[in-house]
Amino acid sequence: MVLVLINGRPLSINWADKFVPAILEAWYPGSQGGTAIAEALFGDYNPGGKLTVTFPKTVGQIPFNFPAKPASQVDGGQTPGVKGNQSRINGPLYPFGYGLSYTTFEYSNLQLSSPVITDKEPVTVTCKIKNTGTRSGDEVVQLYTRDVVSSVTTYEKNLRGFERVHLEPGETKEVSFQLLPRDFQLLNKDNHWVVEPGMFQIMIGASSEDIRLKKGLEIRAYGQASANEIIESDPRDFISASKNKSISSMWLTETIPLPGKVKKGNTYPSNWQRTPK
């Protein structure tokens, strides 16, 4: 038995998920929808689509959108913010980006053009995808980012790119994405779009919850200088740090004077001021 859905929005289909062996999401397929559905059901066409919405397990979870910010609805066995929507009660029935195929795919060899960039530079992300099944098919490779620490609440994950790749059985291809500075921006408390220095997670997945590969990326402020250039042994010296700047990977939530005992070799943005001159 196969359930074919013809609908225009997410549905609550827990019973079908539990008792029906297969579900085909057709949405509103148009005048040739019958032919397309038949080709998919009989195997003449290998589906490769992914959900652009989240299907909830219960209507009590609505609104249940992607991207989502950390929620207070926490499953006792989960840590808030660690697994995205899985941190909510029960999690989704089908997450954003989910979709099956008549074949299987393997993800490997995630690479960044650089592990450290400035807030003015792009970064190239590459990975390899292999068709490990017996049929040719398409996989939609999805790129997500996560801001590890930020001055304001941000989304748990952001979709920053996707690529549909056709692969024959046993074939491997390399997929490449480019992340620009604007892909790391957030709207701060002053309603300004900024890139805050710090650590980000770069994630490659088959859906928003099925993350196959991940790497850390550090972003530093443009023109960041070495503390060797200004730190002296005089304890009267200090650096006046403006809000949300970092030193030694620690985030400062207020304007804080840092004593002159800061160790040599630490870094700070070039627009910080040293007093006395």
Where does each model-flagged region fall?
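Intrinsically disordered, low-complexity Pro/Gly/Ser/Thr-rich segments with frequent PxxP/GP/PP motifs
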Residues: 151-187
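Terminal connector regions
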Residues: 180-227
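Compositionally biased low-complexity segments at domain edges in trafficked proteins
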Residues: 229-272
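Secreted, periplasmic, or luminal enzymes acting at the cell surface/secretory milieu
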Residues: 6-138, 144, 164, 169, ...
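Intrinsic-disorder/low-complexity, polar/charged segments enriched in Ser/Thr/Lys/Arg/Asp/Glu/Gln
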Residues: 122-124, 172-176, 212-214
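Hydrophobic anchor at the start of a short beta-strand
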Residues: 1-2
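Short coil/turn motifs at secondary-structure junctions
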Residues: 132-134, 148-150, 182-184, 209
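Short acidic, flexible loop segments centered on an aromatic residue
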Residues: 134-151, 157-159
